[in-house]
């Protein structure tokens, strides 16, 4: 009977402990993180029984001490190492919720792999602002940086089409895109029929603006044999009637910039088309001769025949002459070698006698014209002459 009473008392004690858990048990329940990870799962009876049977004696002792020392606990100073249970409960609860949130974020694949919206917006803005025209123009800008501004300061910076073709295999399509937009202009090199150079339109206009200030003509640019008999014998300003007001050079250049450049982007132009774009009446022959004279003297036009003119680059005659000399000198030097080939590093060390164009630029030019080719070797890049015909 005593054994049964003891068993009943122990069961009653267990029920009382479970129904009125102490603060310490509350803290332990809050610190039990397994409950937060498995909120939807049903509680395990085995775990609860093992906890109760293993800790009944300890919890009963703690409850007894709490009942006996209630009066003394009010007068005792607060221990820093043993904080207030309510505060501990709050801290544990917040820590528990933080861990649950981190765990949920870790398990939420949408949250983990969601891209940064601000970075996406910046990338979209960058892709929208960077067009095909900008990319192609940047390639020409890089090649333009190789221009010798000191030696050829009278000419706008230009890029040889052969050099651009060597760096961009789809150069023909790229040039047509930029040319159609009016971003660049194409000019035929006077010393060759199949050579062209590229000039950015803004650089071309800046160069023409400088011609307004200069009162003298560009030296070594206009030769008497390039002019027709009518232009040689005519003196538009003197022979014009008194009532005819001839345009000044600055006025003609303004018409050229504002009316011709935006509306015409070909290599050559006919006489009638030129005056149509400049809004010059066909019957006013004195004014027409006056305009042609000034444009030829400024180096903007070269007369191809009686009815056709080709556009030229002001001040670039010296560069084109040195370009042709440099091409021939390099090819002739390679042709004189036994195997008609030379290492690129050895060629770069040589100095040209008849040209002041940079050796690196001439090599790119000849590669673009398919006059030479580069073969990689163990000693470095080898330059071999492919053909040596009349340039």
UniProtKB/Swiss-Prot annotation:
Pfam families: Stk19 (PF10494). The keyword DNA-binding applies. Keywords: DNA damage, DNA repair, DNA-binding, Nucleus. One of its GO terms (biological process) is positive regulation of Ras protein signal transduction. One of its GO terms (molecular function) is protein serine kinase activity. It is found in: Nucleus. Residues 1-24, 49-63, 82-95 have a biased composition (Low complexity). InterPro entries: STK19-like. The keyword Nucleus applies. Residues 64-74 have a biased composition (Acidic residues). Its main location: nucleus. Residues 1-95 are annotated as: Disordered. DNA-binding protein which is required for efficient transcription-coupled nucleotide excision repair. Belongs to the STK19 family. This is Winged helix repair factor 1.
């Amino acid at each position: 009977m005593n054994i049964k009473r003891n068993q009943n008392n122990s069961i009653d004690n267990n029920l009382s402990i479970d129904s009125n858990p102490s603060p310490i048990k509350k803290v332990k329940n809050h610190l039990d993180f397994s409950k937060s990870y498995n909120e939807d799962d049903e509680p395990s009876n085995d775990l609860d029984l093992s906890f109760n049977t293993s800790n009944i004696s300890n919890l009963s002792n703690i409850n007894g001490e709490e009942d006996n020392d209630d009066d003394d606990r009010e007068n005792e100073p607060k221990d820093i190492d043993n904080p207030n249970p309510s505060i501990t409960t709050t801290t544990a609860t917040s820590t528990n919720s933080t861990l649950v949130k981190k765990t949920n974020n870790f398990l939420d694949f949408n949250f983990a792999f969601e891209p940064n919206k601000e970075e996406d917006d910046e990338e979209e803005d960058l892709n929208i602002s960077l067009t095909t025209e900008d990319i192609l123009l940047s390639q020409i800008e890089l090649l333009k940086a190789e221009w010798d501004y000191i030696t050829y300061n009278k000419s706008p910076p230009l890029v040889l089409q052969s050099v651009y073709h060597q760096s961009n295999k789809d150069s023909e399509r790229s040039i047509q895109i930029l040319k159609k937009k009016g971003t660049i202009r194409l000019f035929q090199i006077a010393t060759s029929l199949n050579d062209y150079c590229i000039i950015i339109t803004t650089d071309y206009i800046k160069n023409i603006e400088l011609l307004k200030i200069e009162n003298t003509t560009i030296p070594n640019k206009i030769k008497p044999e390039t002019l027709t008999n009518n232009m040689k014998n005519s003196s538009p300003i003197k022979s014009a009637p008194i009532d005819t007001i001839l345009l000044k050079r600055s006025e003609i250049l303004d018409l050229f910039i504002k009316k011709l450049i935006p509306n015409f982007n070909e290599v050559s132009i006919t006489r009638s088309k030129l005056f149509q774009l400049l809004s010059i009446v066909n019957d006013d022959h004195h004014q027409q001769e006056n305009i042609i004279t000034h444009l030829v003297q400024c180096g903007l036009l070269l007369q191809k025949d009686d009815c056709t003119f080709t556009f030229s680059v002001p001040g670039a005659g010296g560069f084109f002459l040195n370009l042709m000399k440099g091409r021939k000198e390099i090819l002739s030097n390679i042709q004189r070698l036994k195997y008609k080939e030379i290492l690129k590093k050895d060629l770069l060390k040589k100095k040209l006698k008849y040209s002041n164009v940079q050796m690196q630029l001439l090599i790119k030019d000849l590669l673009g014209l398919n006059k030479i080719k580069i073969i990689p070797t163990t000693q470095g890049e080898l330059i071999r002459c492919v053909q040596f015909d009349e340039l």
